[in-house]
Amino acid sequence: MKKEKRQRLIKQFVKEYEIDKQERLVELLAKKDVLVTQATVSRDIRELNLTKVPSQEGLMIYKVFSEEHLQTDIKLKKKLREVVVKIDCVDQLMVIKTLPGNAHVIGVLFDELDWKEKIGCICGNDTCLIISQSKSDREIIEERLNLII
């Protein structure tokens, strides 16, 4: 089977199922008579820019992101690593302290991502307040950020 078709199947599986392990993709592909190794699936995941995000049940599962969403995610990762000084959390609130003059950029990137767990952000010069509906939603955001930083 051609690589493009295999990768199309992988994207389809990731959209239809909560895939938390590469071995699960190997199994699903085998059911479609596509025999591949875990190493091949790993390369496909990298090429497809699949990202692991927390599911509702707390598992880290693969997700397909649009190119635009992916670019915002990459920008956020880069900026967070460059400017974040400290992150504090309480209940449904997350406070991100940044180097002076950088909080607004972090807020804009968060808004572009449009994460459903985030109600909104309020940013000043060096502080960005991320507001979630609940503590569990804030924990999902915190988990994503910990993977990034």
From Swiss-Prot:
One of its GO terms (cellular component) is cytoplasm. It comes from Bacillus cereus (strain ATCC 14579 / DSM 31 / CCUG 7414 / JCM 2152 / NBRC 15305 / NCIMB 9373 / NCTC 2599 / NRRL B-3711). It is found in: Cytoplasm. Its main location: cytoplasm. PANTHER family: ARGININE REPRESSOR. This is Arginine regulator. The gene is argR1. The keyword Cytoplasm applies. The keyword Signal does not apply. Belongs to the ArgR family. Regulates the transcription of the arc operon, involved in arginine catabolism.
